[in-house]
Amino acid sequence: PFERLSKELAGITPAVIQAILSGGPLPDAVAAKSLAYIRSDLVADDDSGTQWALPLPNPLACQWLKVWLLRRNRIHHQEEPILEEYNFALANSAYHCGGLMAIYAAIQQAAMPDVNTGIVERYYASAIQMPALVIGQLSSRSNHHLEKLENKWLAGEYQKKLQQVSVALGTAIPATLNLEQQSYFALGYYQMGAKLNQDKNEHIAAKKAAETTKE
């Protein structure tokens, strides 16, 4: 993945170096190429996840998006904090739409681990461009998927995360997303997905440790 992403960005390396040296914004092509890489990587093959792990975008591509956004925000005097982990306090609807997308995908994956085509593979490309058309559909499906979950701890965690992100998002779901908003969407999906995977792994480890102690 690193070599492929490097090739994607190779054509704009001089412009990136110039931006770094001058302290100016990174070229928009950095975000556009990173988003295209993430989209093709997730949509082309949804098998990168497992029953216990949600497929995530390439971390390096997400880091490029973050740097592009931070420089852009600084130059436009928009000091929105972009943290290393999911930020429920971030006032950005596109970011929280990405967070919801990750939760919906994780819910389906847990409820239907053997499904041939997952939510990420089927809906990510359209959700990152036109979230208003997709989020509502996924919300309805997630209710059905939650009912099928036998793991009550997992169901409770997903419901809690859904409530938190829904409160942060509010009722204004964007109809379309521009380049900057799509970058926030991708970061929101990545950070929430990483958080869900981490929480699940920690729960599994704690459960195994408790069972070992009983023995």
Regions found by a protein language model. Name each.
Residues 1-215:
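Intrinsic-disorder/low-complexity detector
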